[in-house]
């Protein structure tokens, strides 16, 4: 009896000590306690579930009627606002997941996507004193010993960190990225909480299948929380694309960096979707779209090292002193590392889509994990275009606002099947789908979706990737076989140039068409 009482007191004491230590390390902020965050999340999940049960699932609907569609849209909006409130209170990892949802424009109901998009630019910020504390803890010195000046207003605030402009004692202007002090300590319990919430919602709503999102977040979060890894990624991608004089990646100041503090070169520019900035500086929006398309096509189909967070705040455009266009690529915390096999299969999938070859689409979709007739939906998710357009030929049908609205409105009708695709597909594909959607969003804002150059550059990269893998497989077959594959590759590229020159002539005239393929 005495032993049981002692053990009981010990457990309670350990719990209180753990809570006390958590409060102490987070400046006595009760929001840092796992039980507080868990309770808040549980209450929000129950609230959302009851909202659907009360507002939508209380009766049998004819799901084809306008009344049902309007009511479902209204309830989606209410639920999304409730989740946004939870995200903004719990911050940190929750904001990261919310941003991910806000990027999946063609994969989730538009009410959730539009509601979460605010998190890309308006994430909650921390007082400067909290950031100074992180700098002192990690760099073992006061900020005044490193910086001549440190602007109190952040340049930007994201889910895991915020960035401030500063000047080093040595005179260089730098951008200082400091991790929010509460993020790392709360990350483990937050991911467990989200996993639990998703499991509960999946039991209530069988069509609610976003386990893939939690799995990806659990895998990627520790990587993103290590700013030294981000610095290494920045240097790697700068080296890979040094041939492009128009691409700038900020230099890293390793002497002043740690796992929670990253000091890098300060580079000015306007957000890639800031149309006023682009007009004021006489920047060609088509040239911007072409270079971003070229960069990401090479990343996905050639190098396999893909910057996976290209939202507008992470891509700047500017004019150099020589008056040429420059793209500045920021935030290198999350990269997809694609295997050679994945790049080969994905390249062949795109080539089959561009050739409107249904049999090959099914075959290469299966190589990427998609079973049966879901290959058609998968092709729509990859391209961001309706099936009718895919079958007519992407290069023959111009993208329109009506098409975008149709696609978004139909998303909710096929949401269970979209969930099936995301559960089945090769995990490497998840970051690529997110990246594709973000790039399409940039093109939409720049109004450059109908430019043939994007397809031309991507088609070239697909052909080169496909033949490179074929040559690698035939490395023991002798030089004649390798030579034949090179000849076939050259022939395919020649046909592509002729085809896109022809499309350019039809759409833009001779001179403009010639510029696109030179």
Curated annotation (Swiss-Prot):
Q: Which UniProt keywords apply?
A: ATP-binding, Kinase, Mitochondrion, Nucleotide-binding, Transferase, Transit peptide
Gene Ontology cellular-component terms listed: mitochondrial inner membrane
A GO biological process this protein is involved in?
Answer: lipid homeostasis
* Enzyme Commission (EC) number: 2.7.-.-
Compartments reported by the entry: Mitochondrion
Q: Where does this chain mainly localize?
A: mitochondrion
Q: Which domain of life is it from?
A: Eukaryota
Q: Where does ATP bind?
A: 155-163, 177
Concerning CDD domains, the annotation shows:
ADCK1-like
Specify the Protein kinase domain's residue ranges.
Answer: 149-468
Q: What happens when the gene is disrupted?
A: RNAi-mediated knockdown is larval lethal. RNAi-mediated knockdown in adults results in the thoracic muscles displaying abnormally orientated fibers as well as an abnormal increase in mitochondrial fusion resulting in mitochondrial dysfunction in ATP production, ROS generation and cell apoptosis. Consequently, adults display a held-up wing phenotype, are unable to fly and also display defects in locomotion. RNAi-mediated knockdown in salivary glands also results in an increase in mitochondrial fusion.
Q: Which PROSITE patterns does the entry link to?
A: PROTEIN_KINASE_DOM
**Active site (catalytic residues):** 309 (proton acceptor)
An MF annotation (GO) of this entry? protein kinase activity
Protein task = Essential for maintaining mitochondrial cristae formation and mitochondrial function by acting via YME1L to regulate the mitochondrial structural proteins Opa1 and Mitofilin. This function is likely to be kinase-independent. Functions in tracheal development and larval molting probably by acting in sterol modification and/or intracellular lipid trafficking. The action of this enzyme is not yet clear. It is not known if it has protein kinase activity and what type of substrate it would phosphorylate (Ser, Thr or Tyr).
Q: Which family does it belong to?
A: Belongs to the protein kinase superfamily. ADCK protein kinase family.
This protein's name: AarF domain-containing kinase 1
Say which species the protein is native to.
Answer: Drosophila melanogaster
